[in-house]
Amino acid sequence: MTRYIFVTGGVVSSLGKGIASASLAAILEARGLKVTMLKLDPYINVDPGTMSPFQHGEVFVTHDGAETDLDLGHYERFIRTTMTQNNNFTTGRVYEHVLRKERRGDYLGATIQVIPHITDEIKRRIIKGAGDADVALVEIGGTVGDIESQPFLEAIRQLRFEVGARRAMLMHLTLVPYIATAGETKTKPTQHSVKELRSIGLQPDVLVCRSDHPIDISSRRKIAQFTNVEERAVIALEDADTIYKIPGILHSQGLDDFVVERFGLQCGGADLSEWDKVVDAKLNPEHEVTIAMVGKYMELLDAYKSLIEAMSHAGITNRTKVNLRYIDSEDIENQGTGLLEGVDAILVPGGFGLRGVEGKITAVQFARENKVPYLGICLGMQVAVIEFARNVLGWKDANSTEFDRTSAHAVVGLITEWEDATGAVETRTESSDLGGTMRLGAQDCQLEAGSLVHDCYRKDVIVERHRHRYEVNNNLLPQLIEAGLKISGRSGDGALVEVVEAPDHPWFVACQFHPEFTSTPRDGHPLFSGFVKAALAQHQKNS
């Protein structure tokens, strides 16, 4: 039977519940247990698919096409379990389902209330998401005390009681601030946070205390005394120079032993040698490169969380320190390509909308004409095709219908007809709902033998995840190919362009899919690894 570890946060947000949870999951997995993770988001949006990147950060796409919280990206990077649509749900999703049942008459005229109807639905989804895992870690978003999270906390209180203490425990993350003028860490915020939890019927079993300074044994003993938590279960988690140290830090304090003993699990010891290798490669690089990342959401780098991590993973696999130079594409429009001088490679990620697109196109032109290694992802591929059409083929008005519906040379356009899972044709237009109307999830891609991308993957068919509405216009494809654009990847049925490469260029690859969603620190990703190798070659050439 599945054991549950519920993870909450207190005092302030952004303490790193996702990283701490994923790190504990990684240790339990290293002990031979089957582990899964869930993220429960208290906001009322149905999913984060239509939320602003400046507010929410990245939308992580699962293998089965769910648009989810970026924490699921952390989960997949730390454990081998593949996340699905069942591993993340929101208040909006829960209420939507309950209201749909009410409209159908499933509740037989009952008055619909938060308790029991909403909490029952939350519990049902937790159990479904946990599946047949030995241990399921369930992270509740937000901070204890937020009004939005109350139904979730009540649901886990009920579920904890229903399954019993041998199958459920609560891990609470808090902040232990360091007061410089006093020269000591303060435990009072943690005490009050636990008091808040206990007021709603939740007693934590484990406290993970975050701090930017060491937490001495006397402070941990004081926290244990005032919170009714065993002293061995008060874990000090100081800021680390890489998040991939966290599994080792938690293991060194015996957190996994505490969990295994509490649940009565039979398993072996933790083999963290893979993580030791990751940390060593991360902290002891042999080379260094600088790569320009030209995007439009640079005010909140969490909008590119998986991509930034994927570049770090590529650095790990190549024993290379990857310095990312973050450049807003609008700055290129205003200040020119001088911002790109001296970099070893250029990366253009995905995005939506007209703002900053011309700056991205200019960055592509700079990379192509100056033979600088280039990797384009999603919109980064679409602007590569637009730039090629404008400056090689001579179609100066070439564009995407996303940005200019009147262009005579719309080399990128909206797919207007899709088949749903039943085979029925669904028609979409520019005015269709934004939510849930994209090409989403894992898709097959056929690679052209002898291409750069094939050299990276060393496979004829790959599977990568998508999140987009627009595709290269097949009606104009013959002219693009005739002008030299190389189509090195196509969809499984051969109908859609997935990867393009520029002619007469040392390394220029642009893909419609999002490879960053499948990159991990232990395995890296072949496309990003190849990109960093190309940047290394460029760096050595320029040295």
Swiss-Prot record:
The lineage of its organism: Bacteria, Pseudomonadati, Pseudomonadota, Gammaproteobacteria, Pseudomonadales. This is CTP synthase. Belongs to the CTP synthase family. NCBIfam families: PRK05380.1, PyrG. L-glutamine binds at G351, L379, G380, M381, Q382, E402, R469. CTP binds at S13, D146, I147, E148, K186, T187, K188, P189, T190, Q191, K222. PROSITE patterns: GATASE_TYPE_1. Allosterically activated by GTP, when glutamine is the substrate; GTP has no effect on the reaction when ammonia is the substrate. The allosteric effector GTP functions by stabilizing the protein conformation that binds the tetrahedral intermediate(s) formed during glutamine hydrolysis. Inhibited by the product CTP, via allosteric rather than competitive inhibition. It comes from the Bacteria. Keywords: ATP-binding, Glutamine amidotransferase, Ligase, Magnesium, Metal-binding, Nucleotide-binding, Pyrimidine biosynthesis. It holds the Pfam family CTP_synth_N. Its EC number is 6.3.4.2. GO terms for biological process: 'de novo' CTP biosynthetic process; pyrimidine nucleobase biosynthetic process. InterPro entries: Class_I_gatase-like, CTP_synthase, CTP_synthase_N, GATASE, GATase1_CTP_Synthase, P-loop_NTPase. Homotetramer. GO terms for cellular component: cytosol. It catalyses: UTP + L-glutamine + ATP + H2O = CTP + L-glutamate + ADP + phosphate + 2 H(+); L-glutamine + H2O = L-glutamate + NH4(+); UTP + NH4(+) + ATP = CTP + ADP + phosphate + 2 H(+). Catalyzes the ATP-dependent amination of UTP to CTP with either L-glutamine or ammonia as the source of nitrogen. Regulates intracellular CTP levels through interactions with the four ribonucleotide triphosphates. UTP binds at S13, K186, T187, K188, P189, T190, Q191, K222. ATP binds at S14, L15, G16, K17, G18, I19, D71. Residues 290-541 form the Glutamine amidotransferase type-1 domain. The keyword Protease does not apply. It comes from Pseudomonas syringae pv. tomato (strain ATCC BAA-871 / DC3000).
